[in-house]
Amino acid sequence: MKKPVVEFSRPLQIDRVPALGSRDRLAAEDKECAALAARLGLFKVHSLSAFLTSMPWRGGGLRITGNLQAEFDQVSVVSLEIFRSSIECDVERYFLPPHKSGQDSEIDSDIIQDGVVDLGEVVSETLVLELDPYPRRPGEVFQDIHEDVEPVKISHFTGLLKLKRDLGGGKN
């Protein structure tokens, strides 16, 4: 089976992570930013970086913590104008070997594939979860076009009243 193409790949061999953990600084290059923008539906990714700590966890697993920073352009769903946004958020993910996956229902963990965890993909996935699916420029408010128009109140008896008036039986 062919592995999917990952736009921002930083593979980490879990057996090379020291007992006291490792620290990594990741930064996407321009080409990776362009590929991520296409994948995430953003107009442009200016920068994406993260500081991560990887620690051995639960006998063969890995705990990844840290934070990410991203700066990007996106299109407002209200005005369709491009505007710049930034995100800074925490990263916290857990990985277990396939034979231990699903044994602990308290913590949501991913499966370690072939002894490797892709730190770049961890960062990309965290960014995706932080993006607003309906982005708007700061201060921009969606307004219904017909907001000022009074709704027409129609009664079920309007037709009968009109018929009564037409037949001359009703008051004006």
Give short role names for the model-derived ranges.
Residues P56, F83-S86, E140:
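Juxtamembrane/interface motifs at transmembrane-helix termini
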Residues G61-G102:
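Helix-adjacent hinge/juxtasegments
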Residues A38-V45, V77-R84, L129:
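Short, intrinsically disordered, mixed-charge
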Residues M1-G21, Y94-N172:
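Charge-rich, low-complexity linker and terminal segments
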Residues M1-Q69, D73:
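A positional/architectural concept
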Residues L26, A50-L52, G66-L68, I87-R93, ...:
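A structural signal for short, well-ordered beta-strand segments
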